[in-house]
Amino acid sequence: MTGFGQRLDAAVSARGPLCPGIDPHPELLNAWGLTVDAEGLRAFCDICVAAFAGFAIVKPQVAFFEAYGSAGFAVLEDTIAALRAEGVLVLADAKRGDIGSTMAAYAAAWAGDSPLAADAVTASPYLGFGSLRPLLDTAVANGRGVFVLAATSNPEGVGLQRAVAGDVTVAQSIVDAVAQANREADPAARDGDPVGPFGVVVGATVADPPDLHMLGGPVLVPGVGAQGGRPEALGGLGNARRLLPAVSREVLRAGPAVDDVRAAAERLRDQVAYLA
């Protein structure tokens, strides 16, 4: 089994590091002339799949699918399958986090053998990093990845993430825990991955980001474009093994034409190509 890190490394080398997002805001559905329901959601996603077929990895924002109940989850399942059929890795932005058997159930859904299981999933560590163990173990066993929230760009996160625990910030302690998890990952399951299966999320506009030099895994960097992150400034995040700039609104507002969405994404991919 080829691990997530190895698949990601190959995909980024061939297709660049940009991670376009599928964020079907109701406002975007309206702007694209689509109905704000599951039918409009499906049409929106079909356009995105066609536009992003040549990219390494794509990030659907799960909340916008959940809003439509079971019909929305059906669209998400089909979108994940369609992207993977195009050879695109899928990062489900679900931000799951819980404890014990509940975390194990989330792990089965998003990193096990489930129609919702993507190549990787985002997770929240703020019930304690150890609470993520069922998800980390399930991901490695199935050749999938996990991106753990570390330093987000929303102002509400500053008080918690920049709090000092011992002699490091909470955000740095999360990065360090993920680095340790990468070192401990089963070598047989990793199959010689040049990049570990576990990454972190660090916002593009975060001031004084955590030190990523020892992470040994990928870094998802949301907030590029409309949210203020500058593509040319991302190299300052440090010697991370793989930076994945994530962009949604900056690209999606070019729609609804497939060619226009693709062209907007390709322009940004060219701007961050120096990271690959």
Swiss-Prot record:
Identify the EC number(s): 4.1.1.23
Give yes or no: UniProt keyword Lyase. yes
Residues in the active site? 95
Which reactions are catalysed by this chain? Answer: orotidine 5'-phosphate + H(+) = UMP + CO2
One of the record's GO molecular function terms: orotidine-5'-phosphate decarboxylase activity
Say which domain of life the source belongs to: Bacteria
GO BP annotation list: 'de novo' pyrimidine nucleobase biosynthetic process; 'de novo' UMP biosynthetic process
CDD domains noted in UniProt: OMP_decarboxylase_like
First-level EC class: lyase
For this UniProt record, the keywords arranged alphabetically read as follows: Decarboxylase, Lyase, Pyrimidine biosynthesis
The pathway this protein participates in, as annotated, is: Pyrimidine metabolism; UMP biosynthesis via de novo pathway; UMP from orotate: step 2/2
Which is one Pfam family of this protein? OMPdecase
Q: Give the record's family classification.
A: Belongs to the OMP decarboxylase family. Type 2 subfamily.
Descriptive protein name: Orotidine 5'-phosphate decarboxylase
Starting at the broadest rank, the lineage of the source organism is: Bacteria, Bacillati, Actinomycetota, Actinomycetes, Mycobacteriales
